[in-house]
Amino acid sequence: MKAIFRLVSVFAVSALLALVAGCGGGSSNSSARANVRLVNATTGATLTLNLVSSANSGSTATFGPAAAGGATEYNGVDAGAWSATVVTSDNSLTPFTTASFGFAGDGTYTVLAYQRSGSVGAVNIADSTAAPDTGYANLRVFNTSIDAGVLDVYVLATTATLGSGAAPTLGALGAGIVSATTPLPAGSYKLVVTAAGNPSQVRLTIPSITVADQDQMTLALVSTSGGALVDAVSIKQSGSVTTYRNSQARVRAVAALDSKQLVTASAGTSVLLGTGVVSPSIGTYTLVDSGSQPLNVTVNGVAKSSTLSLAAGGDYTVLLYGASASPAITAVADNNQALPSTGSLLNFRVVNGLIGLNGTLALTLNYTQVATSVAAGSASGYGQVTSAAAPLFQLTSSDAAFTGYSATGGSLVSQGVYTMFVLGTPAAPVITIVKDR
């Protein structure tokens, strides 16, 4: 038996990703039915959900196609276990491995499809929370992002600002964790998501989200391209779906100019390097509005400007390098997404900010080639290496003026993302390793 369910509505777009569910199990029972729908939380792909009954491979169901930000209607399938695969209409995303979902008889479920990098996957959400008291709505939050780490969620008045001493409404949500249900008086709220225990590290701000009387809402937090920031999807039980896409990116500036030069840098309205920063110096990630943003730099009081093109949810490093009289500016995209939690691999790359290097850099880590042909003002790709307690770094160059660098020490942990910044001059390099996640 095969059922095909078509798209019936498209909801507002602004974020991505997933939420949790209860997965029932057991064999298929034709007398018990569950209601299921597909929600497409990808940025631009049209999706179809294919289900195959684990009890009877001849029993299948197809939901879709659903456009990005859209949903299918609820339709019935036999209760029991099903294998689920989400595919795109144009093969623009690679399906994750097939998932196994359980649908209980008389249950209602939302299968939320999401993307991460170039892949698409899905999670099963049980639409089964109890109704709140009159005048209230229920909110629960599910952190589906394996990239963003442990998160706190603050529910504030729409005009409020997040203070440093505030307590989270829902706290310490690790990847795959669903919060308890929290009742809220019906109305509009500002939601702020931060790194756990650190309100200054904002990962998403939703300026206004409205919950109506008797609403039962699940808010899913999902990964972005950079890894640290998140998007969100609000799913009202048996109701509408709205996506909230992050409107910001994270940017850090690295001053790799002549030694002891005073440097400032700002992007849009955000300060990247404050007054009195001395080169060489590596800044920290700062939130900047996405899109086209002016980059303003001063070196010893002399101004230089450029423009940054920032994707929402992205992480970027802006390198200011070369002679202070005519500094060059380049921006590179950073990938701070997590590696698989199994295994002992980590990601490592090199950023070359050497002044006056007439050649390129190459790096081996514990005799494994990590980077080659890294020109000045550029970053290598990420190389995967095995974690080590005291790794051996060997940095070489095609320019004889750089006599090489060899060092042992430190600790590189599995699933980490690291950048080696090579600053200074070939004769006096300044080498710093930064753990980006």
Question: Where in the sequence are the language-model features?
Answer:
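Intrinsically disordered, low-complexity polar regions and short flexible loop motifs
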Residues: C23-R437
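Bacterial N-terminal signal peptides that target proteins for export
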Residues: M1-A12
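C-terminal motif of bacterial Sec signal peptides marking the signal peptidase cleavage site
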Residues: A18-G22
